From Swiss-Prot:
Recorded superkingdom: Eukaryota
Record region (Disordered): 1-86, 284-304
Name of the molecule in the record: DCN1-like protein 3
Family matches, as InterPro entries: DCN-prot (IPR014764), DCN1-like_PONY (IPR042460), PONY_dom (IPR005176)
Broad class of the protein's primary localization: membrane
Organism: Pongo abelii
Compartments reported by the entry: Cell membrane; Cytoplasm; Nucleus; Cytoplasm, Perinuclear region
Keyword Membrane applies: yes
Subunit structure, interactors included: Part of a complex containing DCUN1D3, CUL3 and RBX1. Interacts (via the DCUN1 domain) with the unneddylated cullins: interacts with CUL1, CUL2, CUL3, CUL4A, CUL4B and CUL5; these interactions promote the cullin neddylation and the identity of the cullin dictates the affinity of the interaction. Interacts preferentially with CUL3; this interaction triggers the relocalization of CUL3 to the cell membrane where CUL3 is neddylated. Interacts (via DCUN1 domain) with RBX1.
Gene designation per UniProt: DCUN1D3
Keywords for this protein: Cell membrane, Cytoplasm, Lipoprotein, Membrane, Myristate, Nucleus
Role of this protein: Contributes to the neddylation of all cullins by transferring NEDD8 from N-terminally acetylated NEDD8-conjugating E2s enzyme to different cullin C-terminal domain-RBX complexes and may play a role in the cell cycle progression by regulating the SCF ubiquitin E3 ligase complex, after UV damage. At the cell membrane, can promote and as well inhibit cullins neddylation.
GO CC entries: cytoplasm; cytosol; nucleoplasm; nucleus; perinuclear region of cytoplasm; plasma membrane; ubiquitin ligase complex
Length: 304
């Protein structure tokens, strides 16, 4: 498991445009009087003399007015395009550092090196978050498209950039709607798509449930996982429906399971779990009662 992101730099460009002091199409008039006549300044810098206009020769003023201003929008788009191209180059270099020699993808060995450079364990929650953002289809593999799209999604194009995104990803995963999306992604992520799997192996499901609930461990989770662990023969796999409904189960059923009803539309495995757990608690309670009373109803301190 692992993932990357592209950090797109968009430096802003604030190029000003020059405006002439005068409209070059206007005529410059001198006052009419004895010995004076109206003088017209030809457009685009062909003056009739070196008369100053606001401290600038007419030739210079007219030429300056005829210059077309540079569009700040065009300059900004060009700057953004250059930044995106540079970011793609950095992503290409990063991807090549970990990709397989024969396949255009990061496989298990490259994933280990990638996680090592990120200073994370391949089995920890942060790597699952990267896989979620990369929308990885398979564990221990990032295709070129997944890697590039994922890096762009988190705006990172370097190891340092990806590491810097971890805190915000952890925060995002605490949002109810985002966690639901992550939770459902995790089921698909655990499947072996190349083999056409439609349900998770029991051991894989247990590991993924522990992983996805890293930040928010529901009270019933440990009981549920104990049930799955202690009943291996009766549970071959976990379907998508069971996986998805378990999240609802943790949200509406209390830790004492007292408000669970078999009449509601829960998967049959949940009925079996609740029955098993209630029996276990009953036996546990009876065992504690027997220890506290001792033989013949005597308290332990009264026994010899």
């Amino acid at each position: 498991m692992g993932q990357c992101v592209t950090k797109c730099k968009n430096p802003s460009s604030t190029l000003g445009s020059k405006n002439g002091d005068r409209d070059p199409s206007n005529k410059s008039h001198s006052r009419r009087g004895a010995g004076h006549r109206e003088e017209q300044v030809p457009p685009c810098g062909k003056p009739g003399g070196d008369i100053l206009v606001n401290g600038t020769k007419k030739a210079e003023a007219a030429t300056e007015a005829c210059q077309l201003p540079t569009s700040s929008g065009d300059a900004g788009r060009e700057s953004k395009s250059n930044a995106e191209e540079s970011s793609l180059q950095r992503l290409e270099e990063l991807f090549r550092r970990y990709k397989d020699e024969r396949e255009d993808a990061i496989l298990e060995e490259g994933m280990e090196r990638f996680c090592n450079d990120l200073c994370v364990d391949p089995t920890e929650f942060r790597v699952l978050l990267l896989a979620w953002k990369f929308q990885a289809a398979t564990m221990c593999k990032f295709t070129r498209k997944e890697f590039f799209d994922g890096c762009k999604a988190i705006s990172a194009d370097s190891i340092d950039g990806i590491c810097a995104r971890f805190p915000s990803l952890l925060t995002e995963a605490k949002q109810e709607d985002k966690f639901k999306d992550l939770y459902r992604f995790t089921f698909q992520f655990g499947l072996d798509s190349e083999e056409g799997q439609r349900s998770l192996h029991r051991e894989i499901a247990i590991a993924l449930w522990k992983l996805v609930f890293t930040q928010n461990n529901p009270p019933v989770l440990d009981q549920w996982l104990n049930f799955l662990t202690e009943n291996p023969s009766g549970i071959k796999g976990i379907s998508r429906d069971t996986w998805n409904m378990f999240l609802n189960f943790t949200q509406v059923i209390g830790p004492d399971l007292s408000n669970y009803s078999e009449d509601e539309a829960w998967p049959s495995l949940f009925d079996t779990f609740v029955e098993w757990e209630m029996e276990r608690r009953k036996r546990e309670g009876e065992g504690r009662g027997a220890l506290s009373s001792g033989p013949e109803g005597l308290c332990p301190e009264e026994q010899t």
